[in-house]
Amino acid sequence: MYNASTLRALGIGESARVLEISGAGDSRRLADIGLVPGTEVRCLLRAPCGEPTAYLIRGAVMALRDEDAERVAVEP
């Protein structure tokens, strides 16, 4: 059993594995940047105003808005 959360809930320096992406809208765009089930993601930093947040995804740093990060279910 795992303790699922969202990508948005990760603290700076924390890592997690992607479980699934909810919603149909931009799921393809998120998959194109490497957010697919099984991918390890690490939260690197948040902008001073709170968003976007930078994540390390498959060796590349990507910035995601909170609304996108909330759609990504992860497990520690």
Description of each model-found segment:
Residues 1-76:
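Compact, glycine-rich, soluble single-domain proteins
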